[in-house]
Amino acid sequence: MPLHNLTRFPRLEFIGAPTPLEYLPRFSDYLGREIFIKRDDVTPMAMGGNKLRKLEFLAADALREGADTLITAGAIQSNHVRQTAAVAAKLGLHCVALLENPIGTTAENYLTNGNRLLLDLFNTQIEMCDALTDPNAQLEELATRVEAQGFRPYVIPVGGSNALGALGYVESALEIAQQCEGAVNISSVVVASGSAGTHAGLAVGLEHLMPESELIGVTVSRSVADQLPKVVNLQQAIAKELELTASVEILLWDDYFAPGYGVPNDEGMEAVKLLARLEGILLDPVYTGKAMAGLIDGISQKRFKDEGPILFIHTGGAPALFAYHPHV
């Protein structure tokens, strides 16, 4: 088996059973294409989401190193920070979060509701900064200060997106391949591409397990020119960790994230409303709404390689709906 080296890495089990892979009958009828969805929005901690897969590996490494504090960074409405804080609470660890306000809003819901509200429930120590201009350096500086206070910090990068964390999505590719085997031949897979770990992990896993399926990353924060090296660098780092080759071309669409990261747009919000009304499934304004807008437009514009079934990776994020009201 090509991914046997995954078992070499310490891993905590937070998710348990595979997340559902479901057919969307009403949405498929609406689009005239078979659409399936991988429900990583229902992972069983802190209102779900994809980062829990990464944290199974990252938190295991933190415990191996003897850490008593998890440190990470993100936007005020970061899904990753929320899930990291929940994992810290579950493991009895302290959590320090370095947060920015990337959209410069003073709206009370954004500043206090949604993911930010949940951080308080998890007893997270919040440190604000003007902007995460160099998050790796800023996290190291924060870790130095936390260590000086007598803690043993473990730094988790933005999005949990390093080679170790991204192994969670190599593992996810294995899960997807097993669920599809003998049931459906997926032609294309669509995922939001942000901090790049989910996209890169899937790219490595699917190349070896479902090589006939194309993987499309819909960017949520950057142009293709800026996002491509992030995904490729992680793809190669993951492959090196697993002693695999990774030669599949990284495919990115950057037509759907304007006006910028964390700012809702009309097509993304229409996608959120459409899936809610047709299937009772909640997307979010920052990641999955924009990625689903890409899927919908990609069908309309015939951007996919053929007319076969499409799998959408639902990475979660519904808590942000409350923060972005009244945009929603």
Curated annotation (Swiss-Prot):
One of its GO terms (biological process) is D-amino acid metabolic process. It holds the Pfam family PALP. The modification N6-(pyridoxal phosphate)lysine is found at K51. Its EC number is 4.4.1.15. GO terms for molecular function: D-cysteine desulfhydrase activity. Its cofactor is pyridoxal 5'-phosphate. Keywords: Lyase, Pyridoxal phosphate. The keyword Iron does not apply. It catalyses: D-cysteine + H2O = hydrogen sulfide + pyruvate + NH4(+) + H(+). It is an enzyme of class 4 (lyase). HAMAP family: D_Cys_desulfhydr. Belongs to the ACC deaminase/D-cysteine desulfhydrase family. Catalyzes the alpha,beta-elimination reaction of D-cysteine and of several D-cysteine derivatives. It could be a defense mechanism against D-cysteine. Homodimer. This is D-cysteine desulfhydrase. The gene is dcyD.
